[in-house]
Amino acid sequence: MLSPKRTKFRRHHRGRMKGKANRGNSIVYGDFGLQALEPGWIKSRQIESGRRVLTRYVRRNGKLWVCLFPDKPVTMRAAESRMGSGKGMPEYWVAVVKPGKILYELTGLTETVARKALRITGHKMPVKTQIVINKKF
């Protein structure tokens, strides 16, 4: 699973997800991409499961880029613990995603295979997604 090697602070605020993605909202590397349509948190396990699906389809003749990284810790307290006595320990890591953010990029595949792979990956994501194709392709 993806997680930062070290962070400046151990625990984060939850924050707000308002607005659209103004960076990372267009295909840069590949020919096909998976784009988020709604805001949400994507866990590192979900990113990894999507990457595995795409790697299976890409094999040796294509290339895959994962365009998001889980850099926000989500804390949880122990079950049945009393209120107070501080914030819980970091349980897992999430990537904050805004509408328009490109999640994965692919190249070196036919359009039908790429669409099939990205559709399966989109179903594994906790946010609605759409498949986008690079204009120069």
From Swiss-Prot:
Main localization category: plastid
One GO location term (cellular component): chloroplast
Region of interest: Disordered: 1-21
Family matches, as InterPro entries: Ribosomal_uL16, Ribosomal_uL16_bact-type, Ribosomal_uL16_CS, Ribosomal_uL16_dom, Ribosomal_uL16_sf
One Pfam family linked to the record: Ribosomal_L16
PROSITE patterns: RIBOSOMAL_L16_2
Protein's cellular compartments: Plastid, Chloroplast
Subunit structure: Part of the 50S ribosomal subunit.
The name this protein goes by in its record: Large ribosomal subunit protein uL16c
